[in-house]
């Protein structure tokens, strides 16, 4: 008989969240006491907007670099299939506020300081879909998201600075 599982993200009521936000999904504890934290980094409002794949792909590549420059312990930052944001997996305990500040700072750099030469992993050797990138779209989305501010609470807007 298959094991009964509950997928947390499918239990979240996507109609009541207020993006953009960072939400702590879970803290997982390993057998030796290691902690892994999983965050919902929601950049656009579910079922109202979706970031096109080329822009999302470029944001993904940039966040892989920029987050690691700002905070230790990043394991992975992967886009949601719905294209509204990312899962951010981290070693150790981190607050939604700290992660929201890191994401804000990273998006500020994308919006204002990044050139094509700064985008990592854009060659046929380093990317599985290297033709599907758009720095223009990444910058446009970063600016739109920053205008709204990133909240550390998914249900009540509390924008971090």
Swiss-Prot record:
Record EC number: 4.4.1.21
Cofactor: Fe cation
Residue numbers binding Fe cation: 57, 61, 127
GO BP terms: quorum sensing
Record keywords: Autoinducer synthesis, Iron, Lyase, Metal-binding, Quorum sensing
Known catalytic reactions: S-(5-deoxy-D-ribos-5-yl)-L-homocysteine = (S)-4,5-dihydroxypentane-2,3-dione + L-homocysteine
Co-factor note (free text): Binds 1 Fe cation per subunit.
Pfam families to which the protein is assigned, alphabetical: LuxS (PF02664)
Matches recorded under PANTHER family: S-RIBOSYLHOMOCYSTEINE LYASE
HAMAP family: LuxS
Oligomer and partners: Homodimer.
NCBIfam families attached to this UniProt entry: PRK02260.2-5, PRK02260.3-1
Listed name of the protein: S-ribosylhomocysteine lyase
Source organism (scientific name): Streptococcus equi subsp. zooepidemicus (strain H70)
Encoding gene per record: luxS
């Amino acid at each position: 008989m298959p094991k009964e599982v509950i997928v947390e993200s499918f239990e979240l009521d996507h109609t009541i969240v207020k993006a953009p936000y960072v939400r702590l999904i879970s803290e997982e504890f390993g057998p030796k006491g290691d902690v892994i934290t999983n965050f919902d980094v929601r950049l656009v409002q579910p079922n109202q907007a979706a970031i096109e794949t080329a822009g999302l792909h470029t944001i993904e590549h940039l966040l892989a670099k920029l987050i690691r420059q700002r905070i230790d312990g990043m394991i992975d930052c992967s886009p949601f299939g719905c294209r509204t944001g990312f899962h951010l997996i981290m070693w150790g305990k981190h607050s939604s506020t700290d992660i929201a500040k890191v994401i804000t700072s990273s998006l500020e750099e994308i919006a204002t300081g990044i050139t094509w030469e700064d985008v990592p992993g854009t060659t046929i050797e380093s990317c599985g879909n290297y033709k599907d990138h758009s720095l223009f779209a990444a910058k446009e989305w970063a600016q739109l998201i920053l205008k709204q501010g990133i909240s550390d609470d998914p249900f009540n807007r509390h924008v971090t600075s």
